[in-house]
Every structure is written in C-alpha cells, then in structure tokens.
Swiss-Prot record:
GTP binds at E43, S44, G45, K46, S47, T48, D151, L176, T182, G204, N270, K271, D273, A329. InterPro entries: Gprotein_alpha_su, GproteinA_insert, P-loop_NTPase. This is Guanine nucleotide-binding protein alpha-1 subunit. Residues 35-48 are annotated as: G1 motif. GO terms for cellular component: cytoplasm; heterotrimeric G-protein complex. G proteins are composed of 3 units; alpha, beta and gamma. The alpha chain contains the guanine nucleotide binding site. One of its GO terms (biological process) is adenylate cyclase-modulating G protein-coupled receptor signaling pathway. Residues 32-357 form the G-alpha domain.
Length: 357
C-alpha cells in the first residue's frame, strides 16, 4: 500500500526542492506577485483548500493527472478500513458476520506487504463491501472519535462500487477527499485581476514545521486552516495529544513569530459540517477539549464563537486583526465564495493597515 503513497511523496519532495530553489533566488516578490502562506496542523484540510484553489482558479486536474490518483483513492480506502478494524479491536467489538475475520486477514496482509490495487481485485472488493456492511464495523464507526480514522473513510466506503469500475477515473470530489501527508512545500500559482497569486502549502506534521518559517518572511498574508471537528480527537503522531489543543499551540507559534509580525492573518475554521454533526447529532460536548466552556451544549454557533475566541487569544498583540471564516474545504461552491471574499479583500487593500501592502 505504501508504493502509491511513496510515489506521491517523491513527487512532492521533487517539487518542494524546486520551490525552495526559486524562493532562494527571488527572496522578494515583484509588486504584482502576492505570496500567501497556507498553514495548519496535519489533517486540518489545508491541502484540500489548496486543491480547491487549483479547481477554482486554474484548470483543475487533467484526465491524465486524475488517472494517477486512482492508486491513492484505493490506498486511502484500504488504509481507512485497516484503521477502522484496528479501532474495532481496541473497543473489543466483534464482527457479526464471521466471514469478516478472513477479510480482516486480507486487509492486514495488504497493508503490511504494501500490495497495490488499481482497481481492487474481486477478493478485495468483496472484503471491503462485506466489512463496511458488518454491524460490528458500523458499531465501531459510530465510536470513531475514540480512535484515529480519516474523515474521508465513509465517503470512499460508500463509493466502493463506483471506485471498482474498470474505467473509473477519480472525480474532482474524489481527489478532494484523498489524503497524502504534505512533505515539504507545494505551490499553486494563479492570476486574478492583474495580480499573480503564489500560494504555498507546507507540511503540517510536527516533523515538517521547522522547515518553512525562514522561507516566507515576505508573505503578504497567512491563511491558517484549523479543523473545528478535531476537538474530540487525538494526534496521529502520538495518539494522546488533543488535536485542537495542538492546533492552537501551532497557531500561537505562527501568529507571534517574529517573521510574521506585520503579516495579515486569515483563519479558516474548517470542517464545519463534521463539527455540526458532532455537536448536534452525536452530542459530543465541547468540554471534551475545553473545561471552561459553559455555553449551550448543542448550539453550534455558540461553540464556534468560543473556539474563535480561543484562537484570537493566542495572539500576544491584541490589536492584531485576525480575519475568520467558517469553511467546509470539500465543498467547492462554499470555498469559492470564501476565497473570492478573501482575495478581493486582499486586492482592494482593505488589509493595508495590517501590513499587507
């Protein structure tokens, strides 16, 4: 399973080196170039925001490029099932359908041996379908906040038949749901109203963060992506640290960094759809992450307002303007609306007083 991920990561590394070289050569951008830095903790959705910029402001993904994502879709689907099985075992939940024990063995062997599927063979397709239909797996999925599981798991499980079609080509929505950790720096470049925007996405995992700061001291604005729905989840890296608390600490480091004192900050509170589901349907209290929260337990707006205040409080300079937007990064229309508002604000120089121009 690691082969397709390795190819994707190798390409990221190649592009990252190229970008770093360009940054070293041209430290200061031309006045017609606006450099934006896209930051956020791992799995916040920042790479999805970057993909949306390609879709909205560039030509999106070519058919050839989309075809190369088939491996990633298949890998993400099998990896998600492996994580779901692992979570089920941690919770001591058993399969209802006994055949799923054999399917579990296939999943584990596939993950350990890095077997690649494109598309799934009959055995893997049957295994994934039977497992997703099993009541034990569904019970574990209902408790997914207790273990690590990618947000895209259900999306891909519900699309198994389509993904397994011989002529399957990943759609833009499929690509938006794929997940390969960002290693190094990835860039999207586009033009808007006579300006060239260069947007840089940098690795969000702990091991990646120290690599980017010095390269972007001339960024015009920071877009920090924070996942609202991670308040009841732990980090993939250590499986103990609360994800939202980690994101807050990273935001604190960024917003107070000496390189970004005069840089405007735009905060995307992302995954609002998943957040609403947890607050309203699953009734997962915000007090899981914040003992101090005393607002209504099933009031999404009250909870978001509280989280908003927590992020703003991270800035040592209380006069620093932080522009906040609620987003669902997989919703192209919603992201387009937010991005247009953000970019128009930048172009109209409304952020001039905060050092944008």
């Amino acid at each position: 399973m690691g082969n397709c991920d390795s190819r994707e990561l190798a390409e990221q590394t190649k592009q990252s080196k190229k970008i770093n070289t360009e940054l070293a050569i041209a430290k200061k951008d031309d006045e017609n170039v606006i450099k934006l830095l896209l930051l956020g903790a791992g799995e916040s959705g920042k790479s999805t925001v970057l993909k949306q910029m390609r879709i909205i402001h560039n030509s999106g993904f070519s058919q050839e490029e989309s075809m190369t994502k088939r491996n990633v879709v298949c890998a993400n689907t099998i990896q998600a099932m492996g994580a779901l099985i692992e979570g089920m075992r941690q919770l001591r939940i058993d399969f209802v359908n006994r055949i799923c024990n054999a399917h579990e063995k296939l999943i584990r062997e596939t993950l350990s041996e890095n077997t690649e599927y494109n598309p799934f063979n009959d055995a893997m397709y049957t295994a994934l379908s039977d497992l997703w239909a099993d009541k034990g797996i569904q019970s574990a999925y209902g408790k997914r906040e207790l273990f690590y599981l990618a947000d895209s798991a259900k999306y891909f499980f519900d699309s198994l038949a389509r993904i397994n079609e011989p002529n399957y080509i990943p759609t833009e929505n499929d690509i938006l749901h794929t997940r390969v950790p960002t290693m190094g720096v990835i860039e999207v470049k586009f033009q808007m109203k006579g300006k060239v925007f260069r947007v840089f996405d940098v690795g969000g995992q702990r091991s990646q963060r120290k690599k980017w700061i010095h390269c972007f001291d001339d960024a015009k604005a920071l877009i920090y992506v924070a996942s609202l729905s991670e308040y009841d989840q732990v980090l993939l890296e250590d499986n103990t640290t609360n994800r939202m608390q980690e994101s807050l600490q990273l935001f604190k480091q960024v917003v107070n960094n000496k390189y970004f004192v005069n840089t405007s900050v735009i905060l995307f509170l992302n995954k609002v759809d998943l957040f609403e589901e947890k607050i309203i349907i699953k009734k997962r209290s915000l007090t899981i992450a914040f003992d101090a929260y005393t607002g209504p337990q099933e009031d999404v707006e009250a909870a978001i307002t509280f989280i908003d205040s927590k992020y703003r409080a991270m800035a040592d300079n209380k006069d620093k303007n932080i522009y906040v937007h609620k987003t669902c990064a997989t919703d192209t229309h919603q992201v387009q609306y937010v991005l247009d508002a953000v970019l128009d604000t930048i172009l109209s120089s409304k952020l001039k007083g905060c050092g944008l121009f």
